[in-house]
Amino acid sequence: MREGAGVPAPERCCSIGVLALQGGFEAHAKALRELGADVREVRTPDDLDGLEALVIPGGESTTIGLGVEREGLAEPLADFVRSGRPVLGTCAGMIMLDRDHLGLLDVSVRRNAFGRQLASFEVDLDFDGVPLHAVFIRAPWVEDVGTDVEVLAEVEGHPVAVRQGNILAVAFHPELTDDLKLHQWLLDRVSAA
């Protein structure tokens, strides 16, 4: 059983969206369902209606960006994030949120900073004082952090997990491990609202 799973789902759980244009959206949806969330795949602006939180998954950031533009999702995604609802961006999702893309997270992210596919790796992180196993695949790192951004984890001296307000962004793929802490973070933020 995955770490964090097995806890009885609350009587009323939350409606979480997963951007489903390309990439690892199915694994995120599965993890969230294991925690009792109602999950909706987001492909159009209307799919954001009524959601309480959102995951922007990993994948290929250029392809995801083109899909966001093609489907007219850039401004609706920005409005969603600015509304204060919790958002988790993973790998390419971190890139999509940065200053150079959607401009919603005050960081600059370097794509494929840890190398190509063959340079993929796993590591145990100190994630804001909590142990967390992380899978990095053609992963980015944060090159520049704004003053309102909190660095939660680093690898080789480079930030790989940051938080700014309602946004948690990580350079790795939590959906590829048995640890559901980051998905639980979304549900906890919704419950606290």
Question: Predicted segments — roles?
Answer:
Residues 100-160:
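Pocket-forming structural segment of enzyme catalytic cores
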Residues 55-57, 88, 136, 169-171:
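Structural motif
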Residues 12-14, 129-132, 162-168:
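Beta-strand-turn-beta hairpins that frame and shape the catalytic cleft
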Residues 60-125:
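Cysteine-nucleophile active-site neighborhood
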Residues 21, 92, 172:
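Cofactor-binding loop segments of dinucleotide-utilizing enzymes, especially the Rossmann-like FAD-
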Residues 1-8, 141-193:
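C-terminal and late-domain segments of enzyme folds
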Residues 1-70, 79, 180-184, 188-193:
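N-terminal beta1-alpha1 cap of cysteine-dependent amidohydrolase-like domains
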